[in-house]
Amino acid sequence: MDKILYDALTFDDVLLVPAYSNVLPKETVVKSRLTRQIEVNIPLVSAAMDTVTEAELAIALARAGGIGIIHKNLSIDEQARQVAKVKRFESGIIRNPIHLFEDATIQDAIDLMIRHSISGIPVVEHPTPEGCLLLKGIVTNRDLRMTASSDEKITTIMTTNLVTAKEGIDLLTAEDILMRNKIEKLLIIDDNGYLKGLITFKDIQKRKQCPDACKDSQGRLRAGAAVGIRANTMSRVDALVAAGVDVVAVDTAHGHSQAVLDMVATIKQKYPELQVIAGNVATPEAVRDLVKAGADAVKVGIGPGSICTTRIVAGVGMPQLTAIMKCAEEAKKTDIPLIADGGIKYSGDIAKALAAGADSVMMGSVFAGTDESPGETILYEGRRFKAYRGMGSLGAMSEPEGSSDRYFQDVSAETKKYVPEGIEGRIPAKGKLDEVVYQLIGGLKSAMGYCGVRTITELKENTRFVRITSAGLRESHPHDVMITKEAPNYSTSA
């Protein structure tokens, strides 16, 4: 038996071959699929890491057209709250608005506004046996500023002379009503006066600012969340579904394991319409088995991340480009999207990953340096950095809701009982996420122009690679010159 199967390559080993083109970069379309049922307007996904993705970054990325996967090093309630924050940030019509009953106090309103970062709350009667809520008024933060006592009933300050609209109103008409009446919130009711929804002027403005935002059928930003394989995982999934999550990622270092297959099947059995990403894998056999278990997308990548030490500690893995290509052959048979997770340093790597067969790319370090990431900001020798750590690092695994199960390790009170497969470090701060995304997508569009393709599908089907030498790689980077001013899309520290 031949132990050496084949040579395996990664992004730096190849270049895309330019082709005849009548396509300009600005004419390309970068819309792609995340899962069987979810499309993204840009093929970028943020990693489920505790120094990368929480609500703030997930909101920014969804507004740009991608999607964020909120990490699971959080309590179940907190992770669900993070998802809900994304879902409520921007809506067409808020179908189940946060509300107060008539016997609530002003302090209740203050607490609710602070907890959910909102500025107005409908006031309703206690629900009927059918669960209907009769609208009585609305209280806004302006009303709260006009009162001295927080113990008074909310009915003493709420506005009762309401401007409302009936179900089925379109957003253009709603905007006209808001403008004419100089109000910020339009309450939606049915013929009986029961509360059915809420449209805010702020949401309408947000839609105009980000026309390419990744949204669900109700006009809400899309959000994903990671889950593991612990005993309480289904409780976590229940809470995430209640919060409105669009997709859950069964997130482990080795997706081709029975525990992951069982968890995917369990989730799909209880929530058949919920989209489930499963991973990580590096072989076509793993893709086949996860698809059979019910996965709606498969995440590819064993050890390519900048903070991952799996290939060194365990001696196991697969160079990322070959892993994508091998997995894509199997995924194509069932039309299941692939997510290339890890190893992305530059926008050119995104183009290579997609050309190799991925439908989207998941990135950690690229986004960890943005202002919106939850990592700590560090000032070192006059430069700004952000903390960045692998989910296999000691710090991440030692958290109360830590990631040890991602690496199939038992929870322990002693850090020395963990065998880490990641490190902790810092990366240069990069500024706002939308500026980073602009450069990444600009680079991808440039690649598509060079290759003469208009869509991601054409990029996958109509491109070829050449293998390069170490000398070719050196020639590809700036050489024989001292860089005096770094470009926004190229850094020697990448």
Curated annotation (Swiss-Prot):
Q: Which PROSITE patterns match?
A: CBS (PS51371), IMP_DH_GMP_RED (PS00487)
Q: Which organism is it from?
A: Chlorobaculum tepidum (strain ATCC 49652 / DSM 12025 / NBRC 103806 / TLS) (Chlorobium tepidum)
The record's EC number reads: 1.1.1.205
The protein's annotated pathway: Purine metabolism; XMP biosynthesis via de novo pathway; XMP from IMP: step 1/1
The gene behind this protein is guaB
Its function, per the record, reads: Catalyzes the conversion of inosine 5'-phosphate (IMP) to xanthosine 5'-phosphate (XMP), the first committed and rate-limiting step in the de novo synthesis of guanine nucleotides, and therefore plays an important role in the regulation of cell growth.
One Pfam match, given by its short name, reads CBS
What name has this protein been given in UniProt? Inosine-5'-monophosphate dehydrogenase
Q: What is the lineage of its organism?
A: Bacteria, Pseudomonadati, Chlorobiota, Chlorobiia, Chlorobiales
What keywords appear on the UniProt entry?
A: CBS domain, GMP biosynthesis, Metal-binding, NAD, Oxidoreductase, Potassium, Purine biosynthesis, Repeat
UniProt binding sites for NAD(+): D251, G301, I302, G303
Catalytic residues at: C308, R406
